[in-house]
Amino acid sequence: MRAFAQVDVFTDQAYLGNPLAVVLDGRGLSDEQMQRFAQWTHLSETTFLLPPTAPGADYQVRIFTPGGELPFAGHPTLGSCHAWLQAGGRPADATFVTQQCAVGLVRIRREGARLAFAAPPCQREPIEPTLLASIAQALGLMPSQVRASQRMNNGPVWHGLLLESAETVLGLQPDHARLRALGTKVGVAAICTGQPMLIARANREARASRTQSPPELPQPDLEVRGFAAPIGVEEDPVTGSLNASLAQWLMAEGLMPERYLASQGVCLGRAGQVHLSRDAQGHTLFPYTTLFRSRKSVV
């Protein structure tokens, strides 16, 4: 029997972020056992903590979705770090925790109760036109509703679409079977400005109130949704790797400022908030998070 923790990431309010299961000691588990447990938790990601093998790392993590293993993901990075610290982990550096994963070493900054990570480099390229048309069709979009697009790779590969308005983002009803057949994970976003934002705000509150009273939240600068049917997650509540990739793309193009707030999860009754910024060197992003709850059971 071994302990695991469940934490809620990208929120400071109960049950409104993105939950993560963290097996605190993954030693001795086979790949098959890890995958089977990740399917059992039925969360978007489950992680397994291991002793580090790379010099300079405080611990090692392996990240599984119901459909397979990931080289890197944002909310598992932050949630795993939180669980490791809560379980008594002691980093070599008082202000940074260094995590080892399949993409290498990721430094996680400690700022009081918050954690932040420096996003891995993101490789970007245009989406092939035929594939872009197929993605838009699967999302129910007209070509004119897509302002810009980019294939983004910071470990996970996301096909990012910048849409005309937050209302369009919140109103999407994707054909997940078609996205699964395309084999593409898709992130959609829209800048929250002007009249479209006023409409979207009403939509946000109406959607959130389906499950509980809407929380008082700061208004976001970017509305985000992430669809990942190929890995068994039709819609992810809040996605660190996607938000990091979007930030690197949109900041580089001058479409977003060097510090902004993204919202994700509204259509699932969540209230995820991701704070993104670029450091003084102009190349490192820190998505901030607050983790609300932690509970342990056995596996």
Task: Name each region found by the language model.
Residues 1-72, 78-295, 299:
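Active-site proximal loop and beta-alpha junction motif in alpha/beta enzyme cores
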